[in-house]
């Protein structure tokens, strides 16, 4: 009897010790947050002066709340002007699509460059807008779905005012040197620029600037990338443009917007693409409209 009782007591003591050790071990386990684990690069230009219209690459090791300069590439493309770069990593290489003229100069195409190291860039494609009487071709943004690489560019014609529309261009090869298009994103209304798309589940989400009201708008569709778009409302206050998104390690999305009136890139986060935190200023000296990608 005493032997069974002593055995039971020892069992309870051992169990208590094991539980205590497990609790202590659990308290010491470090689970990295997205902000600590997500290393990002941000491609941007610095302003309207001729010296600022070139490709700059910044790097973040805290999930994109602050950046430091990785490379002033001095890359300006064939026209000597590079603005609004969109960066993506694809098949082991980096690609940047960009606007080729200032916002006051006519542009009928966008260009694409590539790099293996983020420092040295080579232009590989010039993609015509394909729209009659093109006046401006702005802010080409990469969109990849199912291994297919697409670019969404904002195009306006000379024969109308306030008529920017988003058009989709599709890569014909894995080198991204040949492209088809344009295809219009039907339903997404007149005079929208800087359209950035992300698909979550069966829903495509577009974040775009209404160039008339100066608000960032959220649009969705469940039909296709090029049809059925419905306006779901505005984000933030007016005075921001160039929305772009990146997915963090914890599953959240981070949006960047360019506060073009007073300067600076601002950011917010969301777990569902519908509800967003308040904007906060990104530590990224000199940064303007650009995009981020996981390094």
Predicted regions and their residues:
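Secretory targeting and sorting signals
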Residues: 1-36
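Carbohydrate-active catalytic/glycan-binding domains of CAZyme proteins
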Residues: 37-295
């Amino acid at each position: 009897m005493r032997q069974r009782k002593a055995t039971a007591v020892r069992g309870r003591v051992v169990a208590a010790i094991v539980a205590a050790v497990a609790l202590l071990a659990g308290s010491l386990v470090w689970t990295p947050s997205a902000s600590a684990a997500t290393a990002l690069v941000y491609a941007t230009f610095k302003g309207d002066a001729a010296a600022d219209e070139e490709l700059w690459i910044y790097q973040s090791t805290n999930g994109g709340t602050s950046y430091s300069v990785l490379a002033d590439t001095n890359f300006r493309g064939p026209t000597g002007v590079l603005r609004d770069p969109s960066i993506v990593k694809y098949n082991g290489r980096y690609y940047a699509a960009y606007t080729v003229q200032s916002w006051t100069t006519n542009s009928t195409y966008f260009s694409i460059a590539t790099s293996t190291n983020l420092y040295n860039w080579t232009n590989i494609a010039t993609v015509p807008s394909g729209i009659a009487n093109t006046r401006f071709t702005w802010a080409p943004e990469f969109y990849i779905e199912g291994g297919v690489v697409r670019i969404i560019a904002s195009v306006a014609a000379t024969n109308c005012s306030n008529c920017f529309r988003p058009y989709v261009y599709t890569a014909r090869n894995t080198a991204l040197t040949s492209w088809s298009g344009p295809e219009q994103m039907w339903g997404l209304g007149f005079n929208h620029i800087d359209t950035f798309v992300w698909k979550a589940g069966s829903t495509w989400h577009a974040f775009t600037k209404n160039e008339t009201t100066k608000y960032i708008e959220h649009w969705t569709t469940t039909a296709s990338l090029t049809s059925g778009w419905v306006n779901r409302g505005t984000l933030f206050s007016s005075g921001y443009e160039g929305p772009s998104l990146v997915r963090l390690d914890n599953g959240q999305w981070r949006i960047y917007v360019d506060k073009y009136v007073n300067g600076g890139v601002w950011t917010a986060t969301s777990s569902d693409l519908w509800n967003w935190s308040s904007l906060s200023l990104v530590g990224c000296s000199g940064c303007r409209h650009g995009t981020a990608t996981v390094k």
